[in-house]
C-alpha cells in the first residue's frame, strides 16, 4: 500500500532526523492508522536514518500511537463486514506488514458462522442479477466471486449450492 509522504521542504527542522521522523509519522497517522512497517517504509523513503526512525517508532509504540494489534483487529472486523473472508483479510494485513502472530489473532476473531453468513449475504445480493442464466453458469460465477473474496472453494460451493437450490424451490411453485 503506497504511503504519501509530505515533501522534504515542509519538514522542520531539517537538521534533526528524529524531529523529521516524528513529523513524518504524525502527518501519516493524522489521516488513518498505520502499521509500524508502513511507517518504517515511509521513513526509509524519506532518507531518515534507521536508528532515529526506530527510536521514534519505539516511542510512538510505547505511547500507543502505533498499535499493530488494535489496527489488525479493527481492520479484520471492518473487512469481514464488507464480505471478505479470513484468508483475504490475512493477505491484506500481510501486505501492510503485520506479523503473522498478530494476523492470526485478528482473523481468529472472525468465526466460521459469521464468515458463512457473510458469504450467504453476498450470494443473495448477486443472485438476482444472474436470474436469466442457466444454474451451472450462475454457480460458476457465484463461486468465482466468493473465491476472489478469499472464501474457500468448499465453502463457496456449499453456499452457492444451497442458494441456487433455494431459488429453484421458489420458482418451481410458479
Residue ranges, per PLM feature:
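An alpha-helical, amphipathic repeat domain used for nucleic-acid recognition
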Residues: 1-174
Amino acid at each position: 500500500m503506497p504511503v504519501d509522504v509530505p515533501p522534504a521542504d515542509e519538514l522542520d527542522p531539517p537538521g534533526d532526523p528524529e524531529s523529521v521522523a516524528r513529523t513524518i509519522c504524525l502527518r501519516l497517522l493524522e489521516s488513518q492508522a498505520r502499521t509500524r512497517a508502513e511507517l518504517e517504509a515511509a521513513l526509509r523513503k524519506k532518507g531518515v536514518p534507521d536508528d532515529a526512525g526506530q527510536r521514534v517508532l519505539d516511542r510512538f509504540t510505547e505511547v500507543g500511537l502505533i498499535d499493530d494489534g488494535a489496527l489488525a483487529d479493527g481492520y479484520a472486523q471492518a473487512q469481514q463486514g464488507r464480505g471478505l473472508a479470513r484468508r483475504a483479510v490475512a493477505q491484506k494485513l500481510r501486505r501492510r506488514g503485520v506479523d503473522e502472530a498478530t494476523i492470526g489473532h485478528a482473523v481468529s476473531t472472525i468465526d466460521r458462522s459469521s464468515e458463512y453468513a457473510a458469504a450467504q449475504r453476498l450470494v443473495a445480493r448477486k443472485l438476482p442479477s444472474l436470474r436469466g442464466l442457466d444454474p451451472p453458469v450462475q454457480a460458476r460465477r457465484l463461486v468465482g466471486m466468493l473465491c476472489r473474496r478469499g472464501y474457500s472453494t468448499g465453502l463457496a460451493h456449499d453456499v452457492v449450492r444451497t442458494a441456487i437450490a433455494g431459488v429453484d424451490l421458489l420458482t418451481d411453485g410458479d
